[in-house]
């Protein structure tokens, strides 16, 4: 027994330790349950959150607006973000950065960089010598990359979300344009890393919009495919997307709605910003014409004036969307000269005529990539702020040939809502209704490599090969494996973009490098030397195009295989037990597939032999993993494996699902079948087949990024530190401003209070003069030296003033509380006295309170009355300017003491059982009164209210209870006058108590 106890103690300690760890994890998880999304537009961003109790809500910024400008102002000692930075664009346009997302992932010679310089000449862009990208130079000491500026914006968006959610947030889904390539997507991920955000996914903004549309129309989606076109014209670009909605059967959740991106078309520079720039140029021309002959400078040479004109152009574009003409006016545009000019919608449309001609372009691209016609499109829905321009809607309606354009979606917030729904689905803290999302690859990716071939005996040459890895408009996320079968030494291969013929010449120049990565493999020859007796199954490279659309090379392996013959005696008991357990939890995978870490290899289909003449060139060495993504929908059963895979006789379906248990498969070891029956005699006579053993050797990989090198880790660490220092400086600035505002507010409020009657009654003239003089001195100091004062100095000044005014404020506050507190005390004393008087009137036989308890209550009541009268009398003698002796906290203490005594007696009366009356000498109780009715004599005992147990009637000693059930098994019913007929009949059937039974 002692040994058993000793064994149980460690187990109990271990259990408690596990419980503590789980509770700690739950508490930590509850602190970070909220997730957020950032719809990152060119001009503004929308932030949404999901947290327990708050489903999918748009975050309001500090100005209570639902969208925030993507603007940053950087100065030597301060930084502004959002609306504050937008206001600084007029005062300091050089330090105010906008539309910097157009520079992400671009090198200095990119046409987009030159376009940015022409649009915003006030910004100084310098070349980063390490990456050949550009940096903003505010001053020689202030230089920031576009990724760093974007990191500031993302960090600001998180602070807005955390203030709104009232809890920390670290997980986010960020929207990016669908046309972003690999370099641009990696730049956004690096910016999020600088901001300390964990990116759950980079979701395309068109996909997020389509998801938001589908989530709120889930009931309208059925097995019939519905094709919807979304035309999104924002500030910086235009994207047209064709989406197919229908319900599909999934492995995890059965029939669920799905959206599939079928076609995408885009124009990188067509948007509201270009329209505003055209209007700005028109207004600048009008202003110069108005000042012609005054020998004035060109307004285009004044950055502040151009910033004012751009703001007015933005307003004009909005107003002209609803009005035929409008008057543009700016006070003090330049050199204190006001500007005023009339602009009509016709003039605006003439300025942007070539832009409106480009509106149908993305529609045609989307239809072409989807291989659809306009007749197959059921609805065209407008998204984005620039689609509110009437001419855009007119041209688009003519291009699509529909009766009307759909406007049944929030054009500004749809992407943010769809992204936050995806964030909740990806987070482990929420459970949402499944909605399958199948995004599409915009730019195809292929693998290129060179190998030696022998065309003629003795004549060898190099052959260049291309294999498509991810095809255009193919779904992602997706994993692919490519097998190189004819290499036994180290070699290189290249990852590049595929055919980009669908892009125009200008788009190709903006796209940048079409070469992604060069992969150098090391250790291939050593792996062949390590397994000389094994047959090579090729060099397998595993690729992953993740949910964010970012390509990565997971690993490269050299796979070998041989035939091994095992006798039944070679398998030990432990091995059999291990195989059995593995089959139970792993879906019945055979033991030979578990050796040397070959699980992932066994789950993949073998690719056909390299260079097969009877197959297309693109498929000679490419294969896709058999294991689909988690949200992959059910597909038709795969075709019969060929080549080596067919010889293995494996069944990929069984290995994927793991639904077929080990016992249901043919037993290869000659053991009993699932019912325990002996194997068939024919099987016993067959020789045991040899099993295949696979060996996997990891191959070293050296990557050379060709499109745009990522920031080195040391540079990234410096950028993170730079942003943290800026954030800390902003927090210190906010703390200082808060302290200064508190000090200034205290001075003004106290100066006003000194003239109020209730403050003058409790203070002398000398006291008020002392306080007033100190307040005036502090106010003067704040005006003269407050700008250079630190946060500590401001807080010390405030603490000094509060200490000086503490006595005055205390006296006023106490006098405000006296009437309410004294009235409550009087009521409690009166009720307590009445309660005590009633308690003393209770007959001695029924008394539940002892004399000591009642005496104690009486003493407390008397002491409280005496304290109140004495304190009031003493307070009346004191002048109002002195510290009062009647304190509100003392009154509350007296009330609590008295209430505690009363509550004790009330609870005792509530739960005390009545005592039985004493019996007479002959063993009977006193006769009932003569005026008592027969019904009263026959009345049975009813338990008192609040009593937990039912009272039992007292029986005579010589009588016994009849019946098989206890006397208190049923509630007692009232018999006699006043009882119902049913109660009378029930009472008559029971034994009537004698006189001695009555209480």
Curated annotation (Swiss-Prot):
Signal sequence coordinates: 1-32
Principal location: endoplasmic reticulum
CDD domains: ASKHA_NBD_HSP70_HYOU1
Compositional bias ranges of the Polar residues kind: 574-583
Chain span(s) of sequence motif Prevents secretion from ER: 996-999
Glycan attachment sites: 155, 222, 515, 596, 830, 862, 869, 922, 931
Region ranges (Disordered): 567-694, 909-999
Cellular component terms (Gene Ontology): endoplasmic reticulum chaperone complex; endoplasmic reticulum lumen; extracellular region; mitochondrion
Listed Low complexity bias regions: 669-680
InterPro entries: ATPase_NBD, Heat_shock_70_CS, HSP70_C_sf, HSP70_peptide-bd_sf, Hsp_70_fam
GO molecular function: ATP binding; ATP-dependent protein folding chaperone
Entry superkingdom: Eukaryota
Modification Phosphoserine occurs at: 567
Basic and acidic residues biased stretches: 611-626, 641-668, 949-962
Entry keyword Signal: yes
Any one biological process term the GO annotation gives: cellular response to hypoxia
Family that this chain belongs to: Belongs to the heat shock protein 70 family.
Quaternary structure and partners: Part of a large chaperone multiprotein complex comprising DNAJB11, HSP90B1, HSPA5, HYOU, PDIA2, PDIA4, PDIA6, PPIB, SDF2L1, UGGT1 and very small amounts of ERP29, but not, or at very low levels, CALR nor CANX.
Its job: Has a pivotal role in cytoprotective cellular mechanisms triggered by oxygen deprivation. Promotes HSPA5/BiP-mediated ATP nucleotide exchange and thereby activates the unfolded protein response (UPR) pathway in the presence of endoplasmic reticulum stress. May play a role as a molecular chaperone and participate in protein folding.
UniProt protein name: Hypoxia up-regulated protein 1
Species in which this protein is naturally found: Mus musculus
Gene from which this protein is expressed: Hyou1
